[in-house]
Amino acid sequence: MGELKLINIDKETNYDEWLAFRTNGLGASDIGTLMGLNPYKSKIELFYQKLGLIPIKQDENIPMFYGNRLEEFVANMWEYYDGEDPESVIRNYAAGTKIRICKPITGYITNSDYPHLFLSPDRVMVSKETDKIVYGGKLVNKNFTGVLEVKTINGFASKQWEGGIPPSYVTQLQTYLFGLELEYGEIVFLEDGRKLWTIPMELNLNLRDKIVSEMNEFMHRIDAAKADIENVQMYEPEPDGTEAFEKFLNTKYADSESKTLQGSDDMFQIAVRHKVLAGEIKEMESQHRECSNLLKNHMKEHESLD
């Protein structure tokens, strides 16, 4: 077992120290990006942020703004939720009956077994209200029984994900579990501002190993790039198939020049495959559109087939 430590850095009063700490490691919320699961941010963007070559975005969007301010409320309501019936929150809250207990931790947690990782879970679970989680500036992690991650979610948007949640939420919670050396955690959701539900999760050792492998490989790139910053492009993560990676490259190379690059055999094969796939996609889209039109023409004003 690794040694867990609590590190307190006040972003508001010591921004430079906070920024240096953040850029020298990975947080649990970075893991989805690292694994190619974040539709809004690419691994290559994370790479340049950790090198300090592009800024870490600090501006809150509307979901982040309300999510941050609702975190305490949702965590408090989780304590009254029986895990099955959303209306149990109302009954237990009215009766003053807490089903389980969670507590916030101020600061970042590090684990000596994972030196590149820093953790800031929304809440940790404890058995009793009187259980301390920090004493004398040190963690009392023997009292941790689980970890709780709090999310607000739009019901319509959640339908695009298998299981109703973005896969990056899963990797985030799993990272908290192995980083805090816990076996159990939950994600609690407030859906559309009115429905509370949870997804319980146990530590997945296979996923842990994949995450740790990706972390180590990524941080090796970071360390190598810092030592050879003039040749930073040599250490960039390899392109993947995510739209976020495509968007980053389009922005980076927006100002192209009318020059020809001598290609290799590998690049030629990639270009051929790109052309073949583009043709297949176009044909599939045409077939999909034809099927859609046939169905619409057959069903007319009806909404479903029996």
Indicate residue ranges for each PLM-predicted region.
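Accessory terminal regions of nucleic-acid processing enzymes
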Residues: 1-306
